[in-house]
């Protein structure tokens, strides 16, 4: 599988909930190659291990990807310190992604918690043919 690596600028940052952050990153080459269900590896500044983070948005026209992650340790806390204009070291797209069924009349997408964001590109692909069922730990999420 072909993947790309580089330093890409953060265009948007949102705090979605306690310990839950969303970023939009400008990386046209990765966005052009990405498919629903794939992920990227992001290297937090000062760390040696990359963090795998699922894609929750792919905009091929704008050349952006969107990621959402939960703060779980020092690596994701370092990533969450990035602000608009900062660059992230991104490697991707990785993984095989979801199997797309272009002829499907109806699909049901089921996810829970931090497993919901990767379903967004899939729901966008199927549009009105998709029924989405999402579960969360609490109303805060």
Where are these regions (language model features)?
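Ferredoxin-reductase
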Residues: 2-84, 137
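FNR/FR-type flavoprotein reductase catalytic core
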Residues: 74-141
């Amino acid at each position: 599988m072909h993947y790309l690596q580089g330093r890409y600028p953060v265009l948007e940052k949102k705090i979605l909930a306690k310990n839950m952050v969303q970023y939009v990153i400008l990386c046209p080459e990765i966005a052009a190659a990405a498919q629903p269900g794939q992920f990227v590896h992001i290297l937090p500044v000062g760390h040696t291990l990359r963090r795998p983070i699922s894609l929750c948005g792919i905009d091929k026209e704008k050349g952006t990807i969107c990621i959402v992650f939960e703060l779980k340790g020092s690596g994701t806390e370092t990533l969450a310190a990035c602000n608009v204009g900062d660059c992230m070291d991104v490697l991707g797209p990785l993984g095989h992604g979801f199997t797309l069924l272009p002829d499907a009349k109806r699909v049901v997408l089921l996810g829970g918690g931090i497993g919901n964001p990767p379903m967004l590109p899939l729901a966008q692909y199927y549009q009105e043919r998709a029924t989405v069922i999402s579960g969360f730990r609490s109303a805060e999420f």
